[in-house]
């Protein structure tokens, strides 16, 4: 089945974004290993990419043309939402430009830009994080030396 089977419902526009997020996470991890080798954090890349893929897919599926006459602002770009623009309303009822929310997600922010409520329910956020394989080996933070 592999990666292709898992990403079959993700738009082709989302794949470069996921690869970019993976590369950014990899370089951030390598940098942390070089700068702070004894306290390097455990990075679970597959979990973050899974959440990113889910969010990009939801953003694509649940975006719509804005038609409200009320003067609302997109808190990400600080512009007024105009009739006919592609927007996405989150579960917390906040509305953003579709492209602005995608940019927010590219930075691995999985919460509302305004109220910080999680974009995915807690039971879904934890899904896969225990079962996923870390892309980097676990580092012991204990003071005992094995040399």
Swiss-Prot record:
Zinc finger region(s), RING-type: 74-116
One term under GO cellular component: cytoplasm
Pathway: Protein modification; protein ubiquitination
Induction of its expression: By the proteasome inhibitor MG132. Down-regulated during reinitiation of mitotic activity.
GO biological process: abscisic acid-activated signaling pathway; cellular response to hypoxia; positive regulation of abscisic acid-activated signaling pathway; protein ubiquitination; regulation of response to osmotic stress
Free-text domain note: The ring domain is sufficient for the interaction with NAC19.
Protein name: E3 ubiquitin-protein ligase RHA2B
Biological source species: Arabidopsis thaliana (Mouse-ear cress)
């Amino acid at each position: 089945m592999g990666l292709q089977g898992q990403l079959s419902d993700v738009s082709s526009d989302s794949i470069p974004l996921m690869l970019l997020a993976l590369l950014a996470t990899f370089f951030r991890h390598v940098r942390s290993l070089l700068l702070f080798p004894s306290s390097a954090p455990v990075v679970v890349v597959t979990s973050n990419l899974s959440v990113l893929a889910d969010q990009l897919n939801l953003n694509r599926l649940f975006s719509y043309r804005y038609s409200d006459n009320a003067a609302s602002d997109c808190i990400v770009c600080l512009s007024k939402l105009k009739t006919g623009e592609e927007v996405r309303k989150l579960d917390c009822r906040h509305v953003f430009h579709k492209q602005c929310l995608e940019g927010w997600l590219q930075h691995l922010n999985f919460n509302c830009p305004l109220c910080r409520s999680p974009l995915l329910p807690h039971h879904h956020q934890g899904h896969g994080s225990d079962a996923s394989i870390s892309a980097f080996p676990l580092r012991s933070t204990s003071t005992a030396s094995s040399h």
